[in-house]
Amino acid sequence: MSELTHFDAKGNAWMVDITEKEETHRVAEVRGEVVMAPATLELIQQGGMAKGDVLGVARVAGIMAAKSTPNLIPMAHPIMITGVNIDFQILPPDRVEIRGLVKTGGKTGVEMEALTAVSVAALTIYDMCKAVDKGMMIQNIRLVSKSGGKSGDFMREGESQWEK
């Protein structure tokens, strides 16, 4: 396992200096899901939630969250994000899977931005549906793949191709 990069020799937290790192094309894909009562999923699909278009608002929230990551994660660098896609799969009878894909051409990866995007999209779904279903669960938020950078590529075993 690699050494932790956000601590100096004395154990003090610090922001990694990326000044000399090479700019490369970087992509991170993260997935997660919100599990809910089947009736809640039906309301989402039918556009019947009182707060409006649940998935549309969650998509915008996820995009905004990716761009706000350095304000939330102390050691995350403010970077030029070149693309954010938030997609959803309805998985009857009781869940919505969320996929966040974040891209940059920079000196550091976008894993934290993708994780933040999916997390906030899931929280937004919860917020918009909690009036009818307080038992929803946000779960299984994970990095599926990343490419670019010094540490190389990563692909989680056992993940299926995203179906749109």
Swiss-Prot record:
It catalyses: (8S)-3',8-cyclo-7,8-dihydroguanosine 5'-triphosphate = cyclic pyranopterin phosphate + diphosphate. SUPFAM superfamilies: Molybdenum cofactor biosynthesis protein C, MoaC. It is an enzyme of class 4 (lyase). Its EC number is 4.6.1.17. It comes from the Bacteria. It holds the Pfam family MoaC. Belongs to the MoaC family. Homohexamer; trimer of dimers. This is Cyclic pyranopterin monophosphate synthase.
